[in-house]
Amino acid sequence: MSEPRFVHLRVHSDYSMIDGLAKTAPLVKKAAALGMPALAITDFTNLCGLVKFYGAGHGAGIKPIVGADFNVQCDLLGDELTHLTVLAANNIGYQNLTLLISKAYQRGYGAAGPIIDRDWLIELNEGLILLSGGRMGDVGRSLLRGNSALVDECVAFYEEHFPDRYFLELIRTGRPDEESYLHAAVELAEARGLPVVATNDVRFIDSSDFDAHEIRVAIHDGFTLDDPKRPRNYSPQQYMRSEEEMCELFADIPEALANTVEIAKRCNVTVRLGEYFLPQFPTGDMSTEDYLVKRAKEGLEERLAFLFPDEEERLKRRPEYDERLDTELQVINQMGFPGYFLIVMEFIQWSKDNGVPVGPGRGSGAGSLVAYALKITDLDPLEFDLLFERFLNPERVSMPDFDVDFCMEKRDQVIEHVADMYGRDAVSQIITFGTMAAKAVIRDVGRVLGHPYGFVDRISKLIPPDPGMTLAKAFEAEPQLPEIYEADEEVKALIDMARKLEGVTRNAGKHAGGVVIAPTKITDFAPLYCDEEGKHPVTQFDKSDVEYAGLVKFDFLGLRTLTIINWALEMINKRRAKNGEPPLDIAAIPLDDKKSFDMLQRSETTAVFQLESRGMKDLIKRLQPDCFEDMIALVALFRPGPLQSGMVDNFIDRKHGREEISYPDVQWQHESLKPVLEPTYGIILYQEQVMQIAQVLSGYTLGGADMLRRAMGKKKPEEMAKQRSVFAEGAEKNGINAELAMKIFDLVEKFAGYGFNKSHSAAYALVSYQTLWLKAHYPAEFMAAVMTADMDNTEKVVGLVDECWRMGLKILPPDINSGLYHFHVNDDGEIVYGIGAIKGVGEGPIEAIIEARNKGGYFRELFDLCARTDTKKLNRRVLEKLIMSGAFDRLGPHRAALMNSLGDALKAADQHAKAEAIGQADMFGVLAEEPEQIEQSYASCQPWPEQVVLDGERETLGLYLTGHPINQYLKEIERYVGGVRLKDMHPTERGKVTTAAGLVVAARVMVTKRGNRIGICTLDDRSGRLEVMLFTDALDKYQQLLEKDRILIVSGQVSFDDFSGGLKMTAREVMDIDEAREKYARGLAISLTDRQIDDQLLNRLRQSLEPHRSGTIPVHLYYQRADARARLRFGATWRVSPSDRLLNDLRGLIGSEQVELEFD
């Protein structure tokens, strides 16, 4: 093979994030196709792609050169930043490069991102080779300015600290000043004996990618392409040129090419991958292995005492636990993982000791008895047939992986503890990368190309919002996309460009739960990335790469449900303490509680973890779970595979005796499988059952059975043929018929694809059960905790308030004197609305109010509150929201009076604050001489109409709390429905139609599997609710009426709803209140007394009626005197449309009782 003549030493991948288009694998593939022997990827201040690049390079026979580009600051150039490329020549250089990158984030973050100080290179110079940065380097900038003194100073620095390791970089990509710089640099090199090196400053693979790269940079920088202010720093020539192209380009400077090869030869870094490095756990004089055995055996004693309080039963059951524990300990110690278990044990125990709620376990880790004994998990794996080998398989060496759930609000405390224990330099969270996803990339590209918002929005909305959606999938899922793509050239151009950018790395973030603990400093294994303040370090390798690099990952996951349980328990135990009862231990509740399962069977699972979706409620209704094993099955069954395969129907039919239970099939079953499959009525539902079947029928070890399960999941034909043979041989040795064994193997293989990890299902079913139990036994505290968790989502809170009302719980309006930021339960068992759930009121103002209340007692009225609270934190807008929500109802006679007095209260408070500041406020404060004035102010103001009060609640709370808009219509609605309220509805006889009315509280349109549209709305008249279905014909006719907060009158047939257990109506006719009035009302009656009538009133009456003329309803004026009453009928030209607006105007003018509709 001929000697290479050129190697690319400066290349950006998409991990640079500010620029760079290609991913590492395609860059390596292109280099290989060009016959390059080596390649450097030098992303901007990071090594994020190093592990992938290193693997891809070696796989393609290309030597990976490790490097990075930097922005550099030095005192010589003031605030001006220059460029520098740093390559690692050896492993010491790699370590120094890692430290340099980490330091840039930790100490050098500026407006332009991470920066290094040039002086840092002095300490970290060993093993590094520098490329000068071309015209953008410090030498380059100085040359272009003709500042020879500055050039000399810069060169002297590099000659002193990087002899033979500093190269003047030459670039020819057609950008301004490149040639001027190049000639000056070559002259300098000759004069000072400095080596030169050629690069192409690569940003993309092919020159045709230039436009896509320009858009990528414009997206990052926030410009449109045609913006004259947009920086134009790149050229179409910055692609991966071939060796021939580079040789032709630098034919006049051959040494610049030769030096690329020499540098490549000098760069020899070995990155240790595929090993594991655990931190040392303190065990005193004992070995880690012995200490684990000691702690596990002590823990098992405690667990057995809890599980089997009866000593005789404990002695009887003990052998199987001891045997299982010994087996697991042997495997853990042989595989070298005792330290891992001890580390997890310690931070979980610390959490429990310090009031941080911890989940019962999740994932396959719940299958370990050692984990249960160490209190890492809280489910007895023997009771639920959970297998250790599903977690840690001695026949397939891989790191154990405990996913641990913590309370969301306290999770960071645990991470802080771990950092304190092992050293902050040894603990870090893990990076995660945001990429340009299908929907967002359409919007971003459209914006940069300058398309109108509506045009881009139309295309973007055609892309389904499903997780993992791609443009390719969207084209298959949405027929309109390919249609507009072919029909519209602008759409085609936008989508084609979006396809080039889809999946490109856009930004970096923090992994939801991953934490790594190193035996030494994190930077011995990976560089760090930090936020702009140099805090919250994360490894620059993502979760898979960081493990491959040797660091052990621990998942500290935040589970909101644990926070809810914790809040509920705090309220419950506060009440129990007042009653002299011991605190409730949620881990000790019985798993067979009848009240909980009765609630579950009624599908009353709103707010219950994992069980609250409509589909899950439907499954619960059909399954009627009556034991904890059924709850474990619920979690496993409610997935697309089981639901679509018919497995769920079989499971339900077998449970309820509609289908014969067989193990696993009527034709092909074996009695030995009964203990394995009995909990699931003979259905192969769990991965553990697949493993147990292989063990029972064919003598597999559980480790070998886990390998079989994995093989079945991957569906590799050659591996399956091998496993089929092993299964057949084992079955034959056990004396099982060969045909039967193979038929069962086929069934197992079929269901293995749907099988779920029972350990995970059981652990999460336990959390589900705990929330179900709390809802059944402590409904107010539980629902208050759930609403607190959802305070930022008004729509969710509204739904949860509805559920509270359905449960018969009383909810009090927010109250500035008794309320808290969050929802809580008072001594009477009523839920007090959380002040923090009021829209438009932040945490700061509420804290200021509660602080003033704690300091000076309850507020007497509005002036008192304003005087005692810091009005800098509590502005007028916030106070208005609090008044409208009802939070100030105790501070005045009514909300209108409070709103009317607000200006005076704020003014008085301001005067009080000023007087206090100069020491002249009297001890009685602002109120000393004002009570009478306040009373007068209140008395002069009329209360708001009920609808205004309710509208204020709706605006600030998202719902009506103290009343209901339907109240003003009830008398009228009785006329339309014959006096029947929704709570009194009954199923209609066949062919009979009944009428119902109510406020629409929910409305949606769904599409069935057959493509038919169905409208569903829920009516509420405060007595009850009714779900109304509108099938195709009715929906086409009335869909425009299906809006929330509209009063509807609906006629149709009423029947039982098998899903909800309530009633539903199939609609035939739908009217809103205006149409009903036009249809049923016979007149609009206005009653006036002789004392009311004058020219002014009649004139205003005329003005109110005028806009509503041309309707069909006649107006009748009733004139009342002490001795007589007369009816005057207005002429036909004064017939009106009796809208809400007209009725409200007239009632406001004359009086609520003097305006009403007349019916036959």
UniProtKB/Swiss-Prot annotation:
Q: What are the transmembrane regions?
A: none
Q: Does the keyword RNA-binding apply?
A: no
The cellular location(s) given in this protein's UniProt record come to:
Cytoplasm
Q: What GO terms fall under cellular component here?
A: cytoplasm
Instruction: List the Pfam families hit by this protein, alphabetically.
Output: DNA_pol3_alpha, DNA_pol3_finger, DNA_pol_IIIA_C, HHH_6, PHP, tRNA_anti-codon
Q: What is its main location?
A: cytoplasm
Keywords in alphabetical order: Cytoplasm, DNA replication, DNA-directed DNA polymerase, Nucleotidyltransferase, Transferase
Which terms under GO biological process does the entry name? DNA replication
Enzyme Commission number, as recorded: 2.7.7.7
Please describe what this protein does. Answer: DNA polymerase III is a complex, multichain enzyme responsible for most of the replicative synthesis in bacteria. This DNA polymerase also exhibits 3' to 5' exonuclease activity. The alpha chain is the DNA polymerase.
Name of this chain's protein = DNA polymerase III subunit alpha
Protein source organism: Escherichia coli O6:H1 (strain CFT073 / ATCC 700928 / UPEC)
The major lineage groups are: Bacteria, Pseudomonadati, Pseudomonadota, Gammaproteobacteria, Enterobacterales
